[in-house]
Amino acid sequence: MTNLRQLVQFAKTEPARIFFISLLAITLSTADQSLFSYAIPGLLEEFEIDLNIIGYMLSASFFVASFAVVFVGMLSDYIGRRLVLVTLLGLSALFVGLHAFADTLLVLTILRVSGFALGAGLYLVASTMVVETAPQKYRGLVAGTLQIGYPFGFAIASLIVVPLIDTYGWRSIFLPAFIVLLISPLIAYVLPESSTFKNLQQTSGDENAKGLSDSLRELLSDHKPHLFICFAGSFLISLAIGGTTYFL
């Protein structure tokens, strides 16, 4: 009962608001990004390509995203989590929505790569905000619960796709992404900045003056085993999800 009361009290706090809004952002972004997988049969037919070309497009998306998330992480340390998260949500939704109007395979590839890279960065920032503001006792719980947004986003996308794609074709399924673009200013209004980031901004010189090379050196020297274990786990999970989502 004590733990239950503590959870109820937590639900009324600013960290809880950050958690629920971040969960919404991840769900919406995942729904947007997953639309591409449903469009693949239509793409193969309209552009008269085989699955190898789709594989190259997806590989390019993941490759660019792997570098984009590093840049996004650095950017969020300098200008704030809130601004970066909302900007990524809006821009990724815009690029996904524009899939509906792509008239060439090159344009479609550029939109896919750009939208996916921005969406990948959003997951990073949302997770960071939630973990660094959650009470230490419940960080594992809220971090795990946040992952609900990924399968839930896919579920929402499937409900949207089924009635649209049969009637209006593959292009129509990307149009709901513009709704997410319209929602992003509202999310910006209600989402508070991470208190941890605000506290870091108030600290003096030495910490804030660290460059990228200094930060990476410190990370590799102090947290190398954890870093590589987490990287390997993330890599293998992404390998499995990517293969089963897009090619089975």
What is each PLM-predicted segment?
Residues 34, 62-70, 155:
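Residue-level signature of mid-helix packing/kink "hotspots" within the transmembrane helices
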Residues 67-103:
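Conserved MFS/SLC helix-loop-helix module at the cytosolic interface between two early adjacent transmembrane helices
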Residues 111-148:
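Cytoplasmic helix-loop-helix junction between adjacent transmembrane helices
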